[in-house]
Amino acid sequence: MAFTLQLGDSAPDFSLPGVDGRTYSLADFSGSPVLVVVFSCVHCPYVVNSEERMLQFDADYSSRGVGFVAINSNAETTYADDGFEGMVARSAERGFNFPFLHDQSQEIALAYGALRTPHYFVFDGERKLRYTGRMDDNPRNPGKETTHELRDAVDALLENREVEVPLTNPIGCNVKWSGQEKHWMPAEACDIV
């Protein structure tokens, strides 16, 4: 059995608190023709160096109805900055316009099979998985990326085309699992590409 959601799988529902004081679920994005769910955090340099691109992606695609939501599932016992207070501070500091949600129980990370931060999951209007993996090929070095798989996938879905590259390996820090050492990953998690 695969650890990570497989192409064509339905988006698992969630009910998670956001840094804005609201609780969000899939229903909050029901009007979006495409939904992007990214597993993110506060401490990881791959995330930190991707935040401008996340903000730009949301700015470019929200006007086209694309939903974008970030979920932090990292155990704050590994990195205290990944706790809810750190999330609130980062969101305010960076000016996040998208929901930034806290998955303290890690149940949603397990349901999606999140491997790394950042790890993107793109769902069509029926909330079937059509792309999973990375945003681009160089999340740690802004301006040096040469591929843009997330944008390509979302563009394809908005234009009613098949996603040409539906699966890539996410590039980033591993999800920090409660009760495990900081570099631990489940053995079955090495199944994506």
Model-derived regions: residue spans:
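Chalcogenol-based redox active-site neighborhoods
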Residues: 1-167, 181-183, 189-193
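A short, charged, Gly/Pro-tolerant segment at domain boundaries
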Residues: 169-181
